[in-house]
Design a protein with these regions (language model features):
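Hydrophobic ligand-binding cavity/cleft-lining segments
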Residues: 1-42
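A conserved amphipathic terminal alpha-helix motif
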Residues: 105, 111-146
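Hydrophobic-ligand binding "helix-grip"
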Residues: 28-32, 36-39, 54-105, 111-113, ...
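N-terminal glycine/threonine-rich, aromatic-flanked beta-hairpin/loop signature
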Residues: 45-47
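Hydrophobic-ligand-binding modules of eukaryotic lipid transfer/binding families
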Residues: 1-8, 15, 91, 99, ...
Length: 146
């Protein structure tokens, strides 16, 4: 199962970063291609993503784990969606660990298990996943500083 991991140490406390990571409403500010977030509930939300051609696409997620200010994990709901043809599983995990007195190590993992013939392109999925996590860390860093 392709898993991509990225991490970075930011100059902000875990609580400061959690205020952003723990609230899906903030995703458009730091997560790549998210135009807006709708239907936010305690354990679910919908990301409205913008494709490269500018077309909005909705993606539903369930929060699988949330322990402030340490870990947040969410998984995409794939059944009966256009994503189901390509992905068997897609989930994101963000872990926050104190680093010194005022820093936080932000570790992200993206698990994407591809389906069927899409397995042949799994190296491309990993490459895109690395870009996505790097862009997410860049966005988070821009919000909290380094």
């Amino acid at each position: 199962m392709p898993t991509v991991r990225r991490s970075r140490t930011l100059r902000a406390t875990p609580e400061e970063i959690w205020a952003i990571v723990g609230d899906p409403h903030h995703l458009p500010r730091w997560w790549p291609r998210v135009a807006r977030v709708e239907g936010v509930e305690e354990d679910a939300f919908t990301q409205v993503l913008t494709t490269a051609k500018g077309v909005p696409v909705g993606a539903d997620f369930h929060v699988r784990e949330s322990e402030a200010p340490h870990v947040r994990r969410w998984a995409q709901q794939l059944v009966n969606t256009p994503f189901e043809r390509v992905l068997a599983e897609s989930q994101v995990e963000v872990r926050l660990e104190p680093a010194g007195e005022t820093g936080t190590r932000v570790a992200m993992a993206l698990v994407q298990r591809v389906r069927g013939l899409a397995v042949l392109g799994s190296f491309m999925v990993r490459s895109a996943g690395r870009r996505q996590l790097d862009d997410a860390l860049d966005g988070l860093e821009a919000l909290v500083g380094r």
